[in-house]
């Protein structure tokens, strides 16, 4: 099965576009993803990106809840209110919009981070710091990385 793995940092061009790494584009092609669902991550200052199946997975979780429950309402607020659909251009570039910049702090470079079934857009230094923190916490807990 194709997965989004590894990370890569690319520069944003003068028109505000960034090239999605070829390995990530290959996964999108293998999965026949035409439209990207992007949402503001719940934990990290990152934008999570996947196909419509990613949105559908969250909507199934919401549908399993009482529609008037606080959990269902919070999840909908995050998934629907904090999400947008986007498309890559013909050259495999993504427009780095205010939606992305405002939430992540991205300015001139984007770090693409594989998360198995989706990928994330990070401000490069924030990714390095979060990864170091995660390693440190696992080390303190005596867990193998």
From Swiss-Prot:
InterPro entries: MraZ (IPR003444), MraZ_C (IPR035644), MraZ_dom (IPR020603), MraZ_N (IPR035642), MraZ_sf (IPR038619), SpoVT-AbrB_dom (IPR007159), SpoVT-AbrB_sf (IPR037914). One of its GO terms (cellular component) is cytoplasm. Keywords: Cytoplasm, DNA-binding, Repeat, Transcription, Transcription regulation. The keyword Cytoplasm applies. One of its GO terms (molecular function) is DNA-binding transcription factor activity. It comes from the Bacteria. Its main location: cytoplasm. Pfam families: MraZ. GO terms for biological process: negative regulation of DNA-templated transcription initiation. PROSITE patterns: SPOVT_ABRB. It is found in: Cytoplasm, Nucleoid. Residues 7-54, 83-126 form the SpoVT-AbrB domain. Disulfide bonds: none annotated. The keyword Repeat applies. Forms oligomers. NCBIfam families: PRK00326.2-4. Belongs to the MraZ family. PANTHER family: TRANSCRIPTIONAL REGULATOR MRAZ. This is Transcriptional regulator MraZ. It comes from Rhizobium leguminosarum bv. trifolii (strain WSM2304). The lineage of its organism: Bacteria, Pseudomonadati, Pseudomonadota, Alphaproteobacteria, Hyphomicrobiales.
């Amino acid at each position: 099965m194709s997965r989004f793995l590894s990370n890569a940092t690319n520069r944003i061009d003068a028109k505000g576009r960034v090239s999605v790494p070829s390995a990530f584009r290959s996964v999108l092609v293998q999965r026949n993803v035409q439209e990207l669902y992007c949402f503001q991550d719940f934990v990290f200052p990152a934008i999570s990106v996947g196909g419509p199946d990613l949105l559908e997975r969250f909507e199934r979780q919401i549908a399993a809840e009482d529609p008037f429950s606080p959990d269902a309402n919070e999840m909908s607020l995050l998934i629907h209110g904090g999400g947008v659909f986007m498309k890559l251009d013909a050259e495999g570039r993504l427009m780095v919009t205010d939606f992305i910049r405002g939430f992540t702090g991205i300015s001139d470079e984007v770090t693409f981070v594989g998360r198995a079934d989706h990928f994330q857009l990070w401000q490069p230094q924030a990714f390095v710091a979060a990864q170091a923190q995660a390693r440190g916490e696992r080390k303190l807990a005596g867990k193998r990385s």
